[in-house]
Design a protein with these regions (language model features):
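A short, N-terminal "cap"/entry segment at the start of jelly-roll beta-barrel domains
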Residues: 1-32, 46
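Conserved short histidine dyad/triad with adjacent acidic residue
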Residues: 20, 35-51, 85
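Short histidine-centered beta-strand/loop micro-motifs
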Residues: 25, 45-50, 92-94
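Short, surface-exposed secondary-structure edge patches
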Residues: 36, 56, 70-74
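Short, conserved beta-strand element in jelly-roll/cupin
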Residues: 38-40, 49-66
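Ligand-binding loop in jelly-roll beta-barrel domains
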Residues: 65, 85-108
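Short acidic-glycine-tyrosine-enriched beta hairpin
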Residues: 71-85
Length: 108
């Protein structure tokens, strides 16, 4: 598994860590990414759009604010989000512990 840390990912604040669960040959050209993402308190993954793909998050720890194509809502453990092709999203950690979620990008 490859682990990365990005600064100001997609124009967000602070650091976002990712642990890539599957490598390219395991994704079988059907998915672009399957990863566990960690966002520290006060940090965020900036708003971005998806084209030719969709993305799903499943929250496994912490709490945050999810920007769903311009509409913001709280997310916490057990919540699922879905961003279809042509739409955008972002997420910020609003809690006092790490926000951790699974992220899956499927190719359309």
């Amino acid at each position: 598994m490859k682990t990365v840390v990005k600064e100001n990912a997609n124009g967000g604040k602070g650091q976002v860590g990712g642990k890539y669960i599957l490598d390219d040959n395991e994704l079988n050209a059907k998915c672009k990414m399957f990863a566990e993402v960690t966002i520290a308190p006060g940090c965020s993954l900036g708003y971005h759009e998806h084209h030719g793909e969709s993305e799903t998050y499943y929250i496994i720890k912490g709490q945050g604010e999810y920007d769903d194509n311009g509409t913001k809502r709280p997310v916490t453990v057990g919540d699922k989000t879905f961003t279809p092709d042509g739409c955008g999203h972002g997420i910020a950690n609003t809690g006092d512990e790490d926000l951790v979620f699974m992220a899956l990008i499927q190719l359309d």
